[in-house]
């Protein structure tokens, strides 16, 4: 493997379609992206999957014993120290890998990252950030937390807003991100105790470009670049958005005329349908970034196929290339917008 390329540890045993689809996505990433891949898991199973692809010099297998199954609790992390997700996190901890991608048990991925990598200084709770498309073509919004913390304190949401701002600015390329707090109304007086207290924190924090509350109708409007909420609300929002995307695609398929008219119509609309799918299909986004731990971790959907794993690896590479971890660290050490960039670029 090359020395200066990004090294991504991929949990080959995690997900509904492991290891075949995980390997397929990893192989494609090794060929199309400037990355080296460490496939972590059961060697015979991984080797059997690799036989369906052309050999790649950028692929290495790292042995692990078993996985944390979807029906198991995160307590299994301690009982299975050599499970694929634990070994993957250890590779980052030992500087053998720069990031982890897993489509396995999301709770286990979060637990392993927190236990083995630890939290970044100044971050009380890691958050899962997911990128959503908006009504404005080419513009997305990152929403966090979408599942790591079902109960939150105001200061947690304040930290989420800071991490989301950094991600939006440096990875998504938004020069001046606009941050919103998900709430039941635009007015600062609206919401429960958590929302009211968080609003005051965000409004008084001059390092966060907070512009006010975001109602449900604003989430995909393109008005906001970052939206923060607790993990309970965020996870419901995530699952609902995924379902709506699938329903829209299914309705479009059903409503296309049958027979030769349908064939002709599909041919004409194919480029537009492809663009629509790219905008609303969760597989196109690859996964969610676990922000706040001392390592780049991407949590993919459990039902991920090869294309989604490829996009998850691409997402991990973008986080590495844009020094997301270093920028979050700098924001805690020097809490001003300008010092974040200066500290990283020294």
Curated annotation (Swiss-Prot):
Its EC number is 2.3.1.274. GO terms for cellular component: cytoplasm. SUPFAM superfamilies: Isocitrate/Isopropylmalate dehydrogenase-like (SSF53659). Catalyzes the reversible formation of acyl-phosphate (acyl-PO(4)) from acyl-[acyl-carrier-protein] (acyl-ACP). This enzyme utilizes acyl-ACP as fatty acyl donor, but not acyl-CoA. It catalyses: a fatty acyl-[ACP] + phosphate = an acyl phosphate + holo-[ACP]. One of its GO terms (molecular function) is phosphate:acyl-[acyl carrier protein] acyltransferase activity. The lineage of its organism: Bacteria, Bacillati, Cyanobacteriota, Cyanophyceae, Oscillatoriophycideae. Its main location: cytoplasm. It is an enzyme of class 2 (transferase). The gene is plsX. This is Phosphate acyltransferase. The keyword Metal-binding does not apply. It comes from the Bacteria.
């Amino acid at each position: 493997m090359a020395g200066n390329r990004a090294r991504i540890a991929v949990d080959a045993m995690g997900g509904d379609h492991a290891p075949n689809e995980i390997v397929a996505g990893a192989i494609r990433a090794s060929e199309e992206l400037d990355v080296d891949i460490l496939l972590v898991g059961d060697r015979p199973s991984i080797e059997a999957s690799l036989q369906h692809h052309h050999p790649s010099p950028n692929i290495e297998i790292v042995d692990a014993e078993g996985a944390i199954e979807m029906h198991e609790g995160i307590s299994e992390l301690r009982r299975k120290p050599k499970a694929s997700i634990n070994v993957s996190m250890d590779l980052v901890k030992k500087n053998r890998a720069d990031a982890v991608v897993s489509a396995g048990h999301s709770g286990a991925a979060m637990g392993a990252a927190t236990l083995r990598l630890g939290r970044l200084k100044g971050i009380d709770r890691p958050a899962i950030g997911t990128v959503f498309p908006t009504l404005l073509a080419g513009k997305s919004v990152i929403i966090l937390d979408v599942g790591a913390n079902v109960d939150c304190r105001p200061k947690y949401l304040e930290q989420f807003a800071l991490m989301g701002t950094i991600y939006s600015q440096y990875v998504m390329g938004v020069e001046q991100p606009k941050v919103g707090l998900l709430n039941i109304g635009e007015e600062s007086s609206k919401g429960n105790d958590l929302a009211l207290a968080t609003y005051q924190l965000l409004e008084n924090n001059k390092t966060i470009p907070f512009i006010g509350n975001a109602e449900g109708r604003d989430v995909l409007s393109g008005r906001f670049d970052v939206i923060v909420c607790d993990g309970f609300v965020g996870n419901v929002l995530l699952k609902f958005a995924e379902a709506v995307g699938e329903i829209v695609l299914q309705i479009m398929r059903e409503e296309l005329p049958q027979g030769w008219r349908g064939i002709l119509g599909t041919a004409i609309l194919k480029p537009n349908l492809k663009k629509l799918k790219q905008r609303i299909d969760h597989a196109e986004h690859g996964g969610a970034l676990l922000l706040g731990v001392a390592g780049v971790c991407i949590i993919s959907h459990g039902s991920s196929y090869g294309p989604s794993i490829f996009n998850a690896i691409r997402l991990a590479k973008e986080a590495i290339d844009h020094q997301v971890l270093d920028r979050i660290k700098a924001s805690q050490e020097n809490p001003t917008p300008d010092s974040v960039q200066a500290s990283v670029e020294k």
